[in-house]
UniProtKB/Swiss-Prot annotation:
InterPro entries: Ripply_fam (IPR028127). A motif (WRPW motif) lies at residues 40-43. Acts as a transcriptional corepressor. Negative regulator of the transcriptional activity of tbx1 that plays a key role in pharyngeal development. Plays a role in the formation of the anteroposterior (AP) axis during embryonic development; required to establish the posterolateral border of the pre-placodal ectoderm (PPE) acting downstream of the retinoic acid receptor (RAR) signaling. Pfam families: Ripply. Keywords: Developmental protein, Nucleus, Repressor, Transcription, Transcription regulation. This is Protein ripply3. The Ripply homology domain and the WRPW motif are both necessary for its transcriptional corepressor activity on the transcription activator tbx1. The WRPW motif is required for binding to tle/groucho proteins. Transmembrane segments: none annotated. It comes from the Eukaryota. Residues 51-78, 142-170 are annotated as: Disordered.
């Protein structure tokens, strides 16, 4: 490598490091791999960020308002930001809602789908309430609900009605 290319590389490296506010700790040995430098990630606080965060907490506590917030990144969000959406809304999300959510959300975020069994839970609760109401009605009317088999009663809380040719034989 000739000296002009070496000088250009050293100058570019120094400019990039200075623009990020990081000192070039290996300027004496440019041949060494620069493994101590890391990429900036908004959810990891640097030394300057920790000092600033500590000063902000102390100033808030001096005002009589204790601040008990964790480390936050851009716009007060703790990174990485995850938006949770039920799997039952997947098709709706893919059609139009996802673009609107991500466009209106001010930071980079990922959307995670979770199992949404609320529909089946609601159906189960309705069935339980119907059985409960049926047995309450039986108790109020003096009917022994344990007498017959459960096959003789429908979910709606009454005896099953035979439809068709078997109507008279039941």
């Amino acid at each position: 490598m000739d000296s002009s290319q070496y000088m250009l590389k050293a100058t570019l490296t120094q400019m990039c490091l200075c623009s990020r506010g990081v000192r070039n700790v290996h300027s004496e040995h440019p041949q060494q791999q620069d493994s101590s430098l890391t990429l900036w990630r908004p959810w990891l606080l640097g030394a300057g960020d920790r000092e600033l965060d500590g000063q902000q907490r102390r100033s808030g506590e001096a005002d009589g308002v204790p601040t008990n917030t964790g480390p936050k990144g851009a716009l007060g969000f703790q990174h990485p930001v995850r938006l949770y959406m039920p799997k039952s809304k997947t098709s709706e999300y893919l059609q139009h809602m996802g673009r609107k959510v991500l466009a209106s959300f001010p930071v980079q975020a990922t959307i995670h789908f979770y199992n949404d069994d609320s529909d089946s839970e609601e159906e189960d609760e309705e069935e339980e309430m119907e059985f409960y109401n049926y047995y309450q009605n039986c108790a109020a009317n003096g009917v022994d609900s344990s007498r017959g088999s459960s096959d003789n009663y429908s979910v709606q809380g009454g005896p099953k009605r035979n439809i068709g040719s078997h109507a008279g034989s039941a």
